[in-house]
Amino acid sequence: MSTRSVSIPTHALIEIIAAPVLMAAPFLLGFNLATGAVALALGTLLMGLAISTVTDQRTIPLTAHASFDYALAVATIVTGLVFGVATSDPVATAFLVGFGAAHLALTASTRYSARGA
């Protein structure tokens, strides 16, 4: 029995919903300019990554997608920690670290196989 219970289409749907949340957070939560710019860039990357999986002709292999997902999740966590220390902004830190941890959990729970085996 596999613990990876999230299918690729479900994973992509969650990312498509989550990416705008990450992009809107700097405006809604009042991040400083630098933290906001990085959050906006990470959200844009997440949206592009999600869109690359919903077409019949994937633009990147699923194994690469998994690697990019892990890297993006870790980058979001590190961004939250670095900017949290640099700016003393607990809201931005909590949001980015939490978002990155949730993305890491989603990535670890996803079956990266074309047929959902």
Enumerate the predicted regions with their spans.
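Short, aromatic-rich membrane-interface segments at the entry and exit
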Residues: 33-40, 88-95
